[in-house]
Amino acid sequence: MADLEEQLSDEEKVRIAAKFIIHAPPGEFNEVFNDVRLLLNNDNLLREGAAHAFAQYNLDQFTPVKIEGYEDQVLITEHGDLGNGKFLDPKNRICFKFDHLRKEATDPRPYEAENAVESWRTSVETALRAYVKEHYPNGVCTVYGKKIDGQQTIIACIESHQFQAKNFWNGRWRSEWKFTITPSTAQVVGILKIQVHYYEDGNVQLVSHKDIQDSLTVSNEVQTAKEFIKIVEAAENEYQTAISENYQTMSDTTFKALRRQLPVTRTKIDWNKILSYKIGKEMQNA
């Protein structure tokens, strides 16, 4: 092991550390960071060399953050990235600095949004917040309005998580929806992601995603927002149901075909007593 350490350059060590961090399960960033920190044993190298990994993790995970003085949380996403560590809160029309390691927001300041698409963005946000409140107990959403290739585009992001470290599991739902404001009909594109980590008496991860495409009738802002939410709700309900049914089927068939839940004797073995069983048998035969 010592020989291997000597063979690895600092650049290679940081690259490996960054991969561990980027792939940390939901809610386990700090644990992975602390483990990597011990392995690397060089805080300056880790902070400087793996800073991009901290940022990438938060962007990928749609990390929610609370800004002091404002009621609602906002998501850290690529769509709100203003560069130089600053992010956009489109609802409150502010920008703020975000520390990717501490996951803290500071220095909120007024920020002018793109007025041409703001009325559409606000309508979609209002409808989406009502939907998220109904379907996600811990859900957070952020809606962006921006011009992409000259076209007015709405981007809606949803994040919901449950971190149950005491019960040995953590999970996160993420979804991202986009549509361009065009006359008559627009194409809606979405991606849904689920990631769950269960680690009691084992180590199991569920990582799943689904791409969605649909058509949206574009009329006025309010009606278009309602129709958009109908598409979101139908797709996310279908995805959740399919995941649940699929893993129930796997539990009932595939997993049972691969391995018996109970031994052939249909009796569970108490492994803590297995040694005493053997000793007792030997004493009887003595």
Curated annotation (Swiss-Prot):
Pfam families xref list: F-actin_cap_A (PF01267)
Role according to the record: F-actin-capping proteins bind in a Ca(2+)-independent manner to the fast growing ends of actin filaments (barbed end) thereby blocking the exchange of subunits at these ends. Unlike other capping proteins (such as gelsolin and severin), these proteins do not sever actin filaments.
Gene3D superfamilies found in the cross-reference section: F-actin capping protein, alpha subunit, F-actin capping protein, beta subunit
GO process terms (BP): actin cytoskeleton organization; barbed-end actin filament capping
Sites of N-acetylalanine modification: 2
Species: Equus caballus (Horse)
Residues annotated with Phosphoserine modification: 9
Assembly behavior: Component of the F-actin capping complex, composed of a heterodimer of an alpha and a beta subunit. Component of the WASH complex, composed of F-actin-capping protein subunit alpha (CAPZA1, CAPZA2 or CAPZA3), F-actin-capping protein subunit beta (CAPZB), WASHC1, WASHC2, WASHC3, WASHC4 and WASHC5. Interacts with RCSD1/CAPZIP. Directly interacts with CRACD; this interaction decreases binding to actin.
Stored PROSITE patterns: F_ACTIN_CAPPING_A_1 (PS00748), F_ACTIN_CAPPING_A_2 (PS00749)
An example Gene Ontology CC term for this record: membrane
Protein known as: F-actin-capping protein subunit alpha-2
InterPro entries attached to this UniProt entry: CapZ_alpha, CapZ_alpha/beta, CapZ_alpha/beta_2, CapZ_alpha_1, F-actin_cap_asu_CS
Domain of life: Eukaryota
Molecular-function GO terms, alphabetical: actin filament binding
Gene (UniProt): CAPZA2
Keyword set, alphabetical order: Acetylation, Actin capping, Actin-binding, Phosphoprotein
Stated family: Belongs to the F-actin-capping protein alpha subunit family.
